[in-house]
Regions:
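Short acidic/glycine- and proline-prone juxtamembrane loop motifs at membrane-interface regions
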Residues: 30, 36-44
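Transmembrane-helix signature of polytopic, membrane-embedded enzymes
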Residues: 2-27, 46, 60-66, 70, ...
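Membrane-interface transmembrane helices that cradle and orient dolichyl/undecaprenyl
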Residues: 16, 51-70, 96-103, 304-307
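Short helix- or helix-capping micro-motifs
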Residues: 18-29, 33, 53, 75-79
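Membrane-interface helix-loop-helix junctions at transmembrane boundaries of multi-pass membrane enzymes
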Residues: 61-66, 100-114, 233-236, 252-270
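Membrane-interface anchor segments at the N-terminal boundary of transmembrane helices
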Residues: 195, 203-268
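Membrane-proximal stem/loop segments at transmembrane-domain junctions that anchor or position
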Residues: 137-220
Length: 322
């Protein structure tokens, strides 16, 4: 992931940004902590960075149609790791359609369509397989029902634990109905939506709490003990948060610099948008923002690179240094 992140930063902002990204990425705990957990985050992180890198490469040569197929292919691989990442290619495609710099509208339409077709081709075998083994329709996973029902209950809607999930609570996790996991997921979704409709006034507050937890902007200390239960040592989460806040601030600066330079920034922001959408419909957890972590590092590195370059330029222009 570090290598791909460095290559992406180099593609967007030059060699200096790539080197800074490689250095920060090698020591940033939230980039390497998931590797030892044998969970999907490490795999999907690589695939997401690869998808965005392929997007920038394709945008440089928009008439090389195979490049857009590669974008969809890598996006499909990302979605097989985490279901919410099925939104990544559509979100990127929306940015392509709205970016005149890529080419004429015809080129952008074809590019977006090719990426979408490739995404569907990657997901089709899994969808067909699921259609043959479950009673109800399952596109990617049956986990959505479980995540929704355990995150839409009294415990998750109030108090100090608002915005989290409760898989071990009998009040939050009702007895499953008869049938396979697709039947269970369908029933859990029904229960979750019913609870949401009955508590509609609380939903906006809960959504804000979920987003705040996802981005460590609301009660971040809660994740110290929460992450221990998932196999992350307490000290790693603490160290990760020490790194995270300066990097996040730097990422905002980097995004602003790219915007001022009229560079195409949308693909770098797309993973963060998808991560946020996932939190809105599930619950907030540091691990869920793993696909967006490399882009925080990249944008911060771009800011540091620009500041360093500006400083060097000022020294060269200072007559006292001549």
């Amino acid at each position: 992931m570090v290598l791909l992140s460095a290559l992406l930063a180099r593609e967007v902002a030059g060699d200096r940004a790539g080197l800074i990204t490689a250095f920060i990425g090698a020591i940033y705990p939230f980039l390497w902590v998931n590797d030892g957990l044998i969970m999907s985050e490490s795999f999907t992180g690589v695939a997401v960075v690869g998808t965005v890198l392929a997007t920038y490469k394709a945008a440089r040569s928009p008439n090389q149609w195979w490049r857009w197929l590669l974008v969809g292919l890598l996006g499909g691989i990302s979605a097989l790791g985490r279901a919410e990442l099925v939104l990544l290619v559509p979100v990127i495609a929306a940015g392509v359609l709205l970016a005149p710099r890529i080419g004429a509208i015809r080129v952008r339409l074809i590019a977006s369509a090719l990426a979408g077709v490739a995404l569907l081709l990657v997901l089709a075998p899994w969808f067909i397989y699921n259609s043959s083994r479950f009673e109800k329709r399952v596109i990617l996973s049956t986990n959505d029902g479980l995540a929704m029902v355990a995150s839409n209950c009294d415990e998750a809607y109030s108090g100090n634990v608002i915005g989290l999930t409760f898989l071990r609570s009998a009040d939050c996790l009702p007895a499953p109905p008869r049938g396979d996991q697709s039947v269970v997921a369908e029933e859990y979704r029904r229960v979750a939506f019913k609870y949401m409709s009955e508590n509609a006034s609380r939903v906006p507050i809960v959504v804000l709490a979920r987003l705040g937890r996802d981005w460590s902007l609301f009660r971040p200390a809660d994740m110290l003990s929460w992450n221990v239960a998932e196999g992350r040592p307490r000290w790693v989460t603490s160290l990760g948060l020490v790194f995270y806040y300066p990097l996040l601030l730097g990422a905002f600066v980097g995004a602003f610099i790219l915007w001022r330079r009229k560079r195409w920034i949308w693909p770098l922001l797309a993973p963060g948008l998808v991560v946020s959408l996932g939190a809105i419909f599930a619950y907030g957890q540091i691990r869920f923002r793993a696909p967006a972590e490399p882009f925080i590092v990249i944008l911060c590195a771009i800011a540091l690179s620009a500041i360093g370059r500006q400083g060097a330029s000022n020294r060269n222009e200072d007559p006292l240094t001549q």
